């Protein structure tokens, strides 16, 4: 049985969304995400504040924390204001291998 987490992050950037997205969509960012088995699902910016970003990822439990710990300096160097980062996590468990018995 394995747990998959869907993480929703919001944070501010000190650049434009397009500048930040170019880095997020880069081969280097893809390599770093894959290293921690993180699948980006969505990224966008707020209509009210174009410097407020939302990112949604899916990953094994605990991997996003390892990613941020290993890559925090790299993220900050791309003008991400880590002090504004907020996270919500949504978990589901894959029970596809569980055998159910009739009562």
Give short role names for the model-derived ranges.
Residues 16, 70, 86-88:
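Acidic, low-complexity intrinsically disordered regions
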Residues 2-3, 34-53, 76-103:
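Glycine-rich beta-strand-turn "strand-cap" elements at beta-sheet edges
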Residues 1-4, 16:
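Positively charged, hydrophobic/aromatic-enriched amphipathic segments
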């Amino acid at each position: 049985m394995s747990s998959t987490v869907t993480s929703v992050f919001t944070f501010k950037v000190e650049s434009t969304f397009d500048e930040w997205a170019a880095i997020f969509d880069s081969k280097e960012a893809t390599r770093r995400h894959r290293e921690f088995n993180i699948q980006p699902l969505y990224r966008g910016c707020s209509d009210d504040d174009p410097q407020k970003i939302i990112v949604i990822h899916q990953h094994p439990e605990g991997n996003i924390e390892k990613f941020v710990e290993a890559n925090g300096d790299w993220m900050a160097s791309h003008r991400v204001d880590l002090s504004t980062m907020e996270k919500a996590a949504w978990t589901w468990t894959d029970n596809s291998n569980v055998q159910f018995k009739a009562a």
